[in-house]
């Protein structure tokens, strides 16, 4: 039989909640909602397998609930603590105390069949971790045990054995100490100590300690300590400590600490700490901390912290923190934080934060934050934030933010934001935003935005936006927008828009739009639009539109439209439309339309349409249509159509048709059709159609269509279509389409499409599309697309796309894409992409991508990517990537990556990575990585890594790493590492390490380590270490170590060690050690030791005070013994150097 279930023991709080807040059932299934199969305590249910193991996770509280649950063995995961297991789900089979749970598990261990289930179809296999399993009486439980247990070991077997039968208390021997004076009543359980004055009443549980004055009443659970003065009443659960002066009343749950002055009342749940002065009343839930001076009243939920000065009142929900000075009153919901100085009154909902100076009043809903100086009053709904300096008064609805200077008053509805300087008054409805400097007064309805300078007054209805400079006065209805500079006065109805310069006066009805320069006066009825430059006076009825230049005077009835240049005078009845150039005079009845260029004089009846060129005079009745050229005089009645030839004056009303010959001047209202001959000037209103021969001048309103011959000039409003012949000039508004032949000049508004022939000049607004022929000049706004043939000049705004032919010059804003032909010059802003053929010059901003052909020059900002053809010159900022063919010159900032072909010159900042072909010249800052081909010259700063082909020259700073192939020359600073191929020359500073191939020459500072191939020549300073192959030459200073192969020449200073192979020559100074192979020659000075192979010559150079003399010895058959170290003794005899304690042998 296979056991597939086990029993697990755990504890919960008295309410059946575990440490994670999960409420366990009294019986039935319990499951973790966030199960994770890991060997950690979180994300699962845990307990002691079969009730044996560490006691660290069992509750020590007397009212803890001991739970036994049944768990499938396959679900169990062992944890690191002895006996602890983790599982996703369980079946609760028993709930009781420690003894009953222990008896339950012990009984089931004796009868394992009660917790196992047999199956005839399959056998359940436990998880890979070892799970102890209960066995019959002959089996024992095996638990993982730590080497050193950090907690007591709990075992249900020992508990059951020591306990009485189930449902009985353990047997203990009563040990009580009771001391009382007369008139007292004492009752204590086991191990209790009761001491009381006369007339007292004390009742204690196990292990309690009660001390009371006369007339006191004390009741405590087991393990408690109570001390009180006379006439006090103390009641506490087990494990509590209570201390009270006379006349106090303390009540607390288990594990609490209460300290009270005289005549105080303390009530707290379990685990609380209360400290109070005399005449205080403290009430708190479990786990709370309360501290109060005398005369204070504190009430808080569980887990709260309250600190109060003298005569203060604090009320807070659970988990709150309250701190107050004397004479303060604080009230807060759960989870709140309140801090107040003396004399303050704070009231807040749950989760709020309140900080107040002295004598302040704060009231806020839940989740609010309030901060105030002294003598301030703040009131806010839930979720609000209020900050005020001293002497301020703030009132706001829920979710609002208020910030005020000294002595300010802010009132706002919910969700509002208010910011003000000192001495300001702000009032706003809900969802509003107000910002004001000192001395300002703002009043706005809900959803409004108000911004004011110093000493300004703003009044607006709901949903309005007001912005003003200092000393301004703005008044607007709801949904209005007003913007004014200093010293201005604006008054508008609801839904209006007003913009004014300094010292201006604007008055408008609701739904109006007013824009003026400085020192202007605008008056309009509701629904009007007025635009004026400085020094103008505009007056209109409701629903009117007026536009005026500087120093103009416009007067119109309601529903009128007036447009005038500077120094113009316009008078019209209601519903009229007037458009005039500067210094014009227009007079019309109601419902009329007048259009005139500068210097014209127009008079028309109501419902008429008059269109005139400059210097013309038109008079027409109502409903007329007039069209005339400049310097013409056209007069027409209502509903008329006028057509004039060159140099004519035509005046027509709306919807008219005018036809004029060459050199004519035609003016027409909206929707007109005009046809003129050679050298004509045509002017038309919105939606007009104009056709003219060569050298004509055409002006059209929005949505017009214009067609002109050779050398024409066309001007059109928004959405116009213009077609012109050779050498034409076209001007169009937004969304226009223009088509012109060669040598044309085109100007368009936003979203326009322009097509021009050879040598054309095009200018366009945002989002335009321009196409031009050879040698064209194109200028476009943001998001434009330009296409031009060779030798074109293109200028575009942000996000533009430019395509140009051979030898073109392109300039673009941010994020542009430019493509140009051969020998082009491209300039672009940040994030641009440029593509050009050979011999191009490209300049880009940060983060740009540039691609150029042969022999190009590229300049880019930070983080750019550049790719260029043969013989290119590239310059880039930090973090750039450059790629060029051989023969190129590259310059890059810090952290750049440059790749170039043969014969290139690369210069980079710190931390750069340079890669180049043969015959290249590379220069880099500190920490750079350089890789070059044959015959390259590399120069780098400190800490650089250089790699080059053969015959290269490398120069590096301190701590550099250089690698070069055959025939290279390397120069490095101190502490460098150099590696070179055959026939290389290396020069390094002190302490350097050099490695070279065959026939290399190495020069290093003192203390260097040199390693070279055969026939190498090594030169180093003092304290050096040199190693070389056969046929090498080594030269070093004092205290050096030299090693070489056969047929080598070694020269060293004093105190050196020289070792070489056969047929070598070794020369050293005093006190040196020389060792060589056969057929070698060794020369040493005083104190030196020489050792050589067969047929070698040993020469000792000695100084006798006047001259040098030599002692010579030869090794071999007729000489001294080979491979023995020899030196010159005090008698100037050559002797072999003995080992310690050996006799020395004189050599004759």
Swiss-Prot record:
Q: Mind telling me which InterPro entries this protein's record contains?
A: Ice_nucleatn
**Alphabetized GO MF terms:** ice binding
Q: Which Pfam families match?
A: Ice_nucleation (PF00818)
Which coarse location class describes where this protein primarily resides?
Answer: membrane
Which residue ranges have biased composition labelled Low complexity?
114-128
What segment(s) does the record annotate as region Octapeptide periodicity?
180-1099
Q: Please give, as recorded in its UniProt entry, the membrane topology of this protein.
A: Peripheral membrane protein
This entry carries the following GO cellular component terms, namely: cell outer membrane
**Where does this protein reside within or beyond the cell?**
Cell outer membrane
> Which spans does this entry mark as compositional bias, Polar residues?
230-250
Keyword entries, A-Z: Cell outer membrane, Ice nucleation, Membrane, Repeat
**Where is the region Disordered?**
110-131, 222-256, 367-394
Described by its record, this protein's role is as follows:
Ice nucleation proteins enable bacteria to nucleate crystallization in supercooled water.
Task: Provide the domain comment.
Answer: Contains many imperfect repeats of a consensus octapeptide A-G-Y-G-S-T-L-T; further on a 16-residue and a regional 48-residue periodicity is superimposed.
- Family assignment from sequence similarity: Belongs to the bacterial ice nucleation protein family.
Under what name is this protein listed?
Ice nucleation protein
Query: Where does this protein come from, organism-wise?
Result: Pseudomonas syringae
């Amino acid at each position: 039989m296979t056991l597939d279930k086990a029993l697990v023991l755990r504890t919960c709080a008295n309410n059946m909640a575990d440490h994670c807040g999960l409420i366990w059932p009294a019986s039935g299934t319990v499951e973790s909602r966030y199960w994770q199969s890991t060997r950690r305590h979180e994300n699962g249910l845990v307990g002691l397998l079969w009730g044996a193991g560490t006691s660290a996770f069992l509750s020590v509280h007397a009212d803890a609930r001991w739970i036994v649950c049944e768990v499938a063995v396959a679900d169990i995961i062992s944890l690191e603590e002895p006996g602890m297991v983790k599982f996703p789900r369980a079946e609760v089979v028993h709930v009781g105390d420690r003894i009953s749970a222990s008896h339950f598990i012990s009984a089931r261990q004796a009868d394992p069949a009660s917790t196992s289930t047999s199956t005839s179809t399959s056998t359940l296999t436990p998880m890979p971790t070892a799970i102890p399993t209960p066995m019959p009486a002959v089996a024992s439980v095996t638990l993982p045990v730590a080497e050193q247990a950090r907690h007591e070991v709990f075992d249900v077997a020992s508990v059951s054995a020591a306990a009485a039968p189930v449902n009985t208390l353990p047997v203990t021997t009563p040990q009580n100490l009771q001391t009382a004076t007369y008139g007292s009543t004492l009752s204590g359980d086991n191990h209790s100590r009761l001491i009381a004055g006369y007339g007292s009443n004390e009742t204690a549980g196990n292990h309690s300690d009660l001390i009371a004055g006369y007339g006191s009443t004390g009741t405590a659970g087991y393990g408690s300590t109570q001390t009180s003065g006379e006439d006090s009443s103390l009641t506490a659960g087990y494990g509590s400590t209570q201390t009270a002066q006379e006349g106090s009343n303390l009540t607390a749950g288990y594990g609490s600490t209460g300290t009270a002055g005289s005549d105080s009342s303390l009530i707290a749940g379990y685990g609380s700490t209360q400290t109070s002065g005399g005449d205080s009343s403290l009430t708190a839930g479990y786990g709370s901390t309360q501290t109060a001076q005398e005369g204070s009243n504190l009430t808080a939920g569980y887990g709260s912290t309250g600190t109060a000065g003298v005569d203060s009142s604090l009320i807070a929900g659970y988990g709150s923190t309250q701190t107050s000075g004397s004479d303060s009153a604080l009230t807060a919901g759960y989870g709140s934080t309140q801090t107040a100085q003396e004399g303050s009154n704070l009231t807040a909902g749950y989760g709020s934060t309140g900080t107040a100076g002295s004598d302040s009043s704060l009231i806020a809903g839940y989740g609010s934050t309030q901060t105030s100086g002294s003598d301030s009053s703040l009131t806010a709904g839930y979720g609000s934030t209020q900050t005020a300096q001293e002497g301020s008064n703030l009132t706001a609805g829920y979710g609002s933010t208020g910030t005020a200077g000294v002595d300010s008053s802010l009132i706002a509805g919910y969700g509002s934001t208010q910011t003000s300087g000192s001495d300001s008054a702000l009032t706003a409805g809900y969802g509003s935003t107000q910002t004001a400097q000192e001395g300002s007064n703002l009043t706005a309805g809900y959803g409004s935005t108000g911004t004011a300078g110093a000493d300004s007054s703003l009044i607006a209805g709901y949903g309005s936006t007001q912005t003003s400079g200092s000393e301004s006065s703005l008044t607007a209805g709801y949904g209005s927008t007003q913007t004014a500079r200093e010293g201005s006065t604006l008054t508008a109805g609801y839904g209006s828009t007003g913009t004014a310069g300094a010292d201006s006066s604007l008055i408008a009805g609701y739904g109006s739009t007013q824009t003026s320069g400085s020192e202007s006066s605008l008056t309009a009825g509701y629904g009007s639009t007025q635009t004026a430059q400085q020094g103008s006076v505009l007056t209109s009825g409701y629903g009117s539109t007026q536009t005026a230049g500087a120093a103009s005077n416009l007067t119109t009835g309601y529903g009128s439209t007036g447009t005038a240049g500077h120094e113009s005078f316009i008078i019209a009845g209601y519903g009229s439309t007037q458009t005039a150039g500067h210094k014009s005079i227009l007079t019309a009845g109601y419902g009329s339309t007048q259009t005139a260029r500068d210097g014209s004089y127009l008079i028309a009846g109501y419902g008429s349409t008059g269109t005139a060129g400059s210097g013309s005079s038109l008079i027409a009745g109502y409903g007329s249509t007039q069209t005339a050229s400049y310097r013409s005089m056209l007069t027409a009645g209502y509903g008329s159509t006028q057509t004039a030839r060159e140099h004519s004056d035509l005046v027509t009303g709306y919807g008219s048709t005018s036809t004029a010959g060459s050199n004519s001047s035609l003016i027409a209202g909206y929707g007109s059709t005009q046809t003129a001959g050679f050298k004509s000037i045509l002017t038309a209103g919105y939606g007009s159609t104009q056709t003219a021969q060569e050298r004509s001048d055409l002006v059209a309103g929005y949505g017009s269509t214009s067609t002109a011959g050779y050398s024409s000039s066309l001007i059109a409003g928004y959405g116009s279509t213009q077609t012109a012949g050779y050498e034409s000039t076209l001007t169009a508004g937004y969304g226009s389409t223009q088509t012109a032949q060669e040598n044309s000049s085109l100007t368009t508004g936003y979203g326009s499409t322009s097509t021009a022939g050879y040598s054309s000049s095009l200018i366009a607004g945002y989002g335009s599309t321009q196409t031009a022929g050879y040698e064209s000049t194109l200028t476009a706004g943001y998001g434009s697309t330009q296409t031009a043939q060779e030798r074109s000049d293109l200028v575009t705004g942000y996000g533009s796309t430019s395509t140009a032919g051979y030898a073109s010059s392109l300039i673009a804003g941010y994020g542009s894409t430019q493509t140009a032909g051969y020998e082009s010059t491209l300039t672009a802003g940040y994030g641009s992409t440029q593509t050009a053929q050979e011999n191009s010059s490209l300049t880009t901003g940060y983060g740009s991508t540039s691609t150029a052909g042969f022999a190009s020059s590229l300049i880019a900002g930070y983080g750019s990517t550049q790719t260029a053809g043969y013989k290119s010159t590239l310059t880039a900022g930090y973090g750039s990537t450059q790629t060029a063919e051989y023969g190129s010159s590259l310059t890059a900032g810090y952290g750049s990556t440059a790749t170039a072909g043969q014969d290139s010159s690369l210069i980079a900042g710190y931390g750069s990575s340079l890669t180049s072909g043969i015959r290249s010249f590379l220069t880099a800052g500190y920490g750079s990585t350089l890789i070059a081909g044959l015959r390259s010259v590399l120069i780098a700063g400190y800490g650089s890594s250089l790699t080059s082909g053969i015959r290269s020259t490398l120069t590096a700073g301190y701590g550099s790493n250089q690698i070069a192939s055959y025939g290279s020359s390397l120069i490095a600073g101190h502490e460098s590492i150099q590696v070179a191929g055959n026939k290389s020359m290396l020069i390094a500073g002190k302490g350097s390490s050099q490695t070279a191939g065959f026939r290399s020459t190495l020069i290093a500072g003192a203390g260097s380590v040199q390693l070279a191939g055969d026939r190498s020549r090594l030169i180093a300073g003092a304290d050096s270490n040199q190693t070389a192959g056969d046929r090498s030459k080594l030269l070093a200073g004092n205290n050096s170590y030299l090693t070489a192969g056969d047929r080598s020449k070694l020269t060293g200073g004093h105190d050196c060690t020289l070792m070489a192979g056969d047929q070598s020559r070794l020369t050293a100074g005093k006190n040196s050690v020389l060792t060589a192979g056969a057929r070698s020659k060794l020369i040493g000075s005083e104190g030196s030791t020489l050792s050589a192979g067969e047929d070698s010559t040993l020469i000792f150079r000695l100084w006798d005070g006047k001259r040098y003399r030599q002692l010579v010895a030869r090794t071999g058959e007729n000489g001294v013994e080979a491979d023995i170290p020899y030196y010159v003794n005090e008698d100037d005899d050559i002797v072999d150097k003995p080992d310690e304690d050996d006799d020395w042998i004189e050599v004759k």
